[in-house]
Amino acid sequence: MSDRFELYLTCPKGLEGLLAEEANQLGLTEVREHTSAIRGSADMETAYRLCLWSRLANRVLLVLKRFSMKNADDLYDGVHAVDWAEHLEADGTLAVEFSGHGSGIDNTHFGALKVKDAIVDKLRSREGLRPSVDKLDPDLRVHLRLDRGEAILSLDLSGHSLHQRGYRLQQGAAPLKENLAAAVLIRAGWPRIAAEGGALADPMCGVGTFLVEAAMIAADIAPNLKRERWGFSAWLGHVPALWRKLHDEAQARAQAGLAKPPLWIRGYEADPRLIQPGRNNVERAGLGDWVKIYQGEVASFEPRPDQNQKGLVISNPPYGERLGDEASLLYLYQNLGERLRQACMGWEAAVFTGAPELGKRMGIRSHKQYAFWNGALPCKLLLFKVQPDQFVTGERRQAAVEEGEPRRQAPVASEPARLSEGAQMFANRLQKNFKQLGKWARREQVDCYRVYDADMPEYALAVDLYQDWVHVQEYAAPRSVDPDKAQVRLLDALAAIPQALGIDPQRVVLKRRERQSGTRQYERQATEGRFQEVTEGGVKLLVNLTDYLDTGLFLDHRPMRMRIQREAVGKRFLNLFCYTATATVHAAKGGARSTTSVDLSKTYLDWARRNLSLNGFSERNRLEQSDVMAWLQNNQESFDLIFIDPPTFSNSKRMEGVFDVQRDHVELLDLAMARLAPGGVLYFSNNFRKFQLDEHLSTRYAVEEISAQTLDPDFARNNRIHRAWQLRLR
C-alpha cells in the first residue's frame, strides 16, 4: 500500500469549514470541502491522529479506490479488483454501507449486496473461506459512495461515528450530538476564552453535553481517547505500534491538562430527572473536578465564578418540541436575555437555536451569527457581547407610572367633554382614591390595583388599573333600578374615567358582571388575544383585559399570593383550581421545591404555562388538567403548602356532576387535608359572599380565619370581597 492516502471525513451539514480548519491543523493536506464532508491527503499517522483528535468529524474514511461505473456489473468488477486479502482475514467479519444512487443502482440495499458479494467472492476464490456479515461490530466496515457515475470505495477507520465519545450513555429528550456541541463551542470562541482562564456556564444544560465538551477542550483531552474499539482494530493494514505511540501522547496530554487548576464550568437544569444522568455523564468523562451540575431555573440563573472571572454563557434553549407553546418559548428567550443583562455583564454569550427569530426577544443585539444544521433542522448560532451598548432598549417596554410622574393622556383633537354633575362627583371620588392608593402602589411596586369599588351606590362599578389600561366591571343593577337611568350613569362614568385618571379613552375596557352560573366564568367575551405583561411582588404575569370576564389575575388575592411566596421556600406546593397559576408563579419565585397546579380548563393551563415561562420557570412545575375532586381522590402525594381558591359554582362538561362551594367544601377540604404533610399549611379562600364554613371542620383540623390579613388597601373598602382560612393538621 502507498505511504499516503486519500481521506474522506464526514460531518454534520454546516461544519465543513470548521472541520477543514481542524483537519488541516492535525496534518491533513490538499483539503477540499464538500457537502457534509471534506477530503484531503494524509499518511497513516495523520489518519490515526484525526480519529483520535477530531472533535467535529463523524467518520474518517480511507479511500481504497475510485472508479467509473455504468451499471451493477461495473460496481461488482470494480470492488472485486481490490486485493481484499490485504485488508481482511478470509474468515473475518464484514459490514457494508452504501450511499447514493444512479448507474442502475436505485436501491442502496441492492448496492450494498453487490459490494459484499464482490468482496466475499474475491476472498473465497483465493482462500477457500468467506467472511461473514456482522452489521453491529465487524472487523472491517466498508463504505461505497456513488456520486454522478463515480464510485468511491473506502474503509471506515472510525467504526462507530466519532460523535459517540462514550461518556453520554444517558441523555434527555432533545440531545445535541457531541461533535455539533463542540463545533458550537469553537464558533463561540471557547478555546480562546478557556486559554485566558475564563469561565463557562450553561443555564439549560440538559445532560451536560456542552459542559463535557468544553472541559475536554480546556483540558486538552482528545475527544476519543477512551474509545476501545475502532474501525481499524482488526484491519490488516493497521500499525499497532504507531497507534500506541499516538495514544500514549494523547494520554500524557490529558493527564497534564487535568493536573492544571480546573476552570469554573457549571451547568444548571430545571428538570430534576436530568440532574443525575448529567452528573453520571460528567463522571464517565473523568471530569468530576472540572464540571458541576446543579438544579436551577433560568429565572435564578446567576453565574458566580470563584475568582469573579468572566467567560462564556452557552445555551441550546428549546425551540419547538420541548415546550410546544410558541408563547412560552418567546417568554423563555425573553427571560434568558433578561438574566444575561442583569447577572452576566461583561460576559460573552452564545445561543444555539432552531428559532432564531426568538433570539430577537432577548433584548441584546447579536454581533455575529453562524448557520448550522441540527440533523434536518436549520439552526443558527447567535453570539452576543453582554454589555450595555449592545442592549436593545424599548423592546417590550410598556408605559409605567414612576413616582411623581403623572399618567399622560393621549393627545385628543378637542377638549374633553364637559362632565355632568353626577359624573364630576364620580370623577372627584376616583381622583381622590387614585391619589391615595397611588402612593401605596408605588411604594409596594404594584402595577395593578382597584381604584374604585362601588364607593358611590349609584355608580355600581369596579374600576381596576392595569398600568396604563383601565378595566371596568359594571355590576348588574337590581330590577328595582330603572335600566335607562343605569345606562346614563354608566355612560357618565365612562366619560369621567379617562379624565380622572389621565388615560387614553381607547384603553378603557368595559365588562358587565352578573351572578356567576355554570361555566360563564370561563366563557370567552372577545377574541382579540391581546396579552399584557404586569408585575407583582417581583414576578411577571400576563393579563388579558378583553377576551374573558376575568383578566387572569384576581387582584383581591394579591396578599395571599405574596404570603405564599414568603412561605414557599423548600416546600412542595399544590395549587387547586389554579386558574392561570399566578399563585404558583409566586411559589416558584419564593423557592418552592416543587409545584403542582390543577385545573380543568386547558385554556387557563396554557395561560399558566406562559406565566411560568415568562418568569423563567420550566415544565418541572407540573400543570395537571383534571377535575380537582377526582384528582384528589386518585392522588397519593404529600404537599407542604396547599392553596385552594375554588369557583362558587361550576358545571363544566369535562367534570362529573356539579361543583357547589357551599355544599362541597367539606369533602374538598377533607380530600386536600389528606394530602397535607405533617407541619404543612392549607389556605382556603373563596368569593361567595354568603359562604359559611362548616363548623365541624374545626373539630378535625386547626382552623383560623385570616380574611382580614388577606386584604390590601385597595380592597379595604370591601371587606366581603373574599374570605380566607388557614388549616393545619391537629
Swiss-Prot record:
Residues 46-157 form the THUMP domain. It catalyses: guanosine(2445) in 23S rRNA + S-adenosyl-L-methionine = N(2)-methylguanosine(2445) in 23S rRNA + S-adenosyl-L-homocysteine + H(+); guanosine(2069) in 23S rRNA + S-adenosyl-L-methionine = N(2)-methylguanosine(2069) in 23S rRNA + S-adenosyl-L-homocysteine + H(+). It is found in: Cytoplasm. It comes from the Bacteria. This is Ribosomal RNA large subunit methyltransferase K/L. Keywords: Cytoplasm, Methyltransferase, RNA-binding, rRNA processing, S-adenosyl-L-methionine, Transferase. Residues 399-418 are annotated as: Disordered. GO terms for cellular component: cytoplasm. Its EC number is 2.1.1.173, 2.1.1.264. Residues 399-408 have a biased composition (Basic and acidic residues). Signal peptide: none annotated. The gene is rlmL. Pfam families: Methyltrans_SAM (PF10672), RlmL_1st (PF22020), THUMP (PF02926), UPF0020 (PF01170). The lineage of its organism: Bacteria, Pseudomonadati, Pseudomonadota, Gammaproteobacteria, Pseudomonadales. The keyword Cytoplasm applies. GO terms for molecular function: 23S rRNA (guanine(2445)-N(2))-methyltransferase activity; RNA binding; rRNA (guanine-N7-)-methyltransferase activity. Belongs to the methyltransferase superfamily. RlmKL family. NCBIfam families: PRK11783.1 (NF008748). Specifically methylates the guanine in position 2445 (m2G2445) and the guanine in position 2069 (m7G2069) of 23S rRNA. It is an enzyme of class 2 (transferase).
